[in-house]
């Protein structure tokens, strides 16, 4: 049986504890004043997607949302992947990237499994409750948004407009 030097073990534990404290302290300093992060807020009833940086509006887009039989989930999620020219997979088969693809030219997957922000092969659906729960966008809008967000971007899907979002949307209408 190997003997353990209690004194050196205690010193090692103390050094590790101090190092852990210093790392946590440094992390707190680094994140005390984080840069304004971009976030997406979708008003499902208004069928609008707002891209914000802090409380500053960067863009407002018209979108399609889930129909009543397949509603858009509500809550706070994050973008977990970004896929240019996605392949659409369904029980009936796959659709390669292109004009017939129901996902359009871009896919931004959400932390709500199976849901995302994507394009459409039915542009007339924008502004309507027409999807299977995802948020659909016009091709040009989608491609612009895709370049402005990253994996980790916060996405809030609201079933009822918040005070902030109501104010933003009413100001956008009056401009």
Question: What is each stretch, according to the model?
Answer:
Residues 49-51, 72, 86-91, 118:
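Short, solvent-exposed loop/turn elements at domain surfaces
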Residues 21-76, 81, 97, 106:
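Cell wall/extracellular polymer interaction/catalysis modules
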Residues 30-35, 92-175:
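Exported/periplasmic cell-wall-interacting domains
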Residues 63-67, 85, 121-123:
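Short, solvent-exposed aromatic-acidic interface loops
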Residues 55, 85, 161-164:
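Short, charged beta-turn/beta-strand-edge "cap" motif at the junction between a beta-strand
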């Amino acid at each position: 049986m190997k003997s353990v030097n209690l004194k050196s073990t205690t010193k090692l534990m103390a050094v590790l504890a101090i190092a852990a404290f210093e790392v946590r302290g440094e992390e707190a300093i680094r994140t005390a004043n984080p840069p304004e992060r971009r976030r997406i807020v979708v008003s499902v009833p208004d069928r609008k997607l707002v891209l914000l940086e802090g409380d500053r509006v960067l863009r407002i887009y018209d979108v399609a949302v889930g129909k009543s039989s397949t509603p858009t989930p509500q809550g706070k999620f994050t973008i977990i992947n970004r896929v240019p020219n996605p392949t659409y997979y369904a029980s009936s088969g796959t659709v390669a990237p292109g004009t017939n693809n129901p996902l359009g030219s871009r896919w931004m997957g959400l932390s709500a499994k199976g849901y995302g922000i994507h394009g459409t092969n039915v542009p007339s659906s924008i502004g309507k409750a027409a999807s299977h729960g995802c948020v659909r966008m016009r091709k040009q809008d989608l491609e612009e948004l895709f370049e402005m967000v990253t994996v980790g971007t916060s996405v809030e899907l609201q079933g009822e407009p918040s005070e902030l979002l109501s104010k933003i949307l009413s100001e956008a209408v009056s401009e």
